[in-house]
């Protein structure tokens, strides 16, 4: 790290410390009870209060100006590639005339920003008057459990489909909240043309642009990217293990398959019968290979694809027939016939 980079990192750390010192928000319980994320400090407690096996959606308050004036909306994700943790989709929106606010925030591709810088921008989005008056945002935390079950179910749902459904769901929730959307900018998953066609079919009245590297081209997408990335980072920091595991910070690494710390975590924290803790995406080849190498092999009988044919028993089968006088002859019970038992007395 160069001397200049070292100075920048130190400044960012100082800013984060100032956020903690100057933030006079209520305690963790109030964060969870209010359901509002009003600063960076509130993000972790909010996430910690949610069930991490289920998806969580959060929408900020909509600035009044976003209800009245035409807005641009950006969409991006964080955590698509890792084998560990959730994938987070984020949106951010502001009036078409409010580019200055995005510039003042310093919005840029979240992957090119340090963690400290992302945290500072996220905090400013939620605390600075020039931002809260015209910028809104929302995220969906898509659990590893949802990702795995979607990709493993009989009618498989690919990660691209999960991503597109989340993006469209967040756009729809912004519409329902009253945001006056005019333009939408999306960082693509898969071919941009197909994604754009799908979005236009769902939202035909919007001007929609789907592009590669949109987070480094459009500041509104950069803002969405920052919200998504900061949310994912904090989701990992406050992750609760219902399996009862005690995991130290950073013991599972970045979560990316190529990270040796992550690979070691997958090797050490594997149950030979039940597999991995809920943090892991079972559907990733890295996890599948680790299970194949270490876990017990399981065999399950394949259910018959054809439904069995049941012949209904007719009521007349229980009777032998009738006598000449028309009296019905009742069939003897199989239990007595097999044991050669018969009635010796008439009652």
Curated annotation (Swiss-Prot):
Which GO molecular function annotation, any one, does this entry have?
Answer: metal ion binding
Q: Which reaction does it catalyse?
A: Endonucleolytic cleavage to 5'-phosphomonoester
Record carries keyword Nuclease: yes
Protein origin, superkingdom: Eukaryota
Q: Gene3D superfamilies from the entry?
A: Ribonuclease H-like superfamily/Ribonuclease H, Ribonuclease hii. Domain 2
- Which intervals hold domain RNase H type-2? 70-296
Cofactor remark from the record: Manganese or magnesium. Binds 1 divalent metal ion per monomer in the absence of substrate. May bind a second metal ion after substrate binding.
**Keyword Repeat carried by entry:** no
- Mind telling me which InterPro entries this protein's record contains? RNase_H2_suA, RNase_HII/HIII, RNase_HII/HIII_dom, RNase_HII_hlx-loop-hlx_cap_dom, RNaseH-like_sf, RNaseH_sf
Residues that hold a divalent metal cation according to the record: 76-77, 187
E.C. no: 3.1.26.4
| A cellular component term, taken from the record's GO annotations | ribonuclease H2 complex
Indicate the enzyme's highest-level EC class: hydrolase
Q: Which cofactor does it need?
A: Mn(2+); Mg(2+)
Keywords of this protein's UniProt record, alphabetized? Endonuclease, Hydrolase, Metal-binding, Nuclease
List this protein's GO terms for biological process.
Answer: DNA replication, removal of RNA primer; mismatch repair
What is the protein's known function? Catalytic subunit of RNase HII, an endonuclease that specifically degrades the RNA of RNA:DNA hybrids. Participates in DNA replication, possibly by mediating the removal of lagging-strand Okazaki fragment RNA primers during DNA replication. Mediates the excision of single ribonucleotides from DNA:RNA duplexes.
Family per record: Belongs to the RNase HII family. Eukaryotic subfamily.
Which PANTHER family does the entry link to? Answer: RIBONUCLEASE H2 SUBUNIT A
NCBIfam families referenced in this protein's UniProt entry, alphabetically: ribonuclease HII
Please state what the protein is called. Ribonuclease H2 subunit A
Biological source species: Drosophila melanogaster
Biological classification of the source: Eukaryota, Metazoa, Ecdysozoa, Arthropoda, Hexapoda
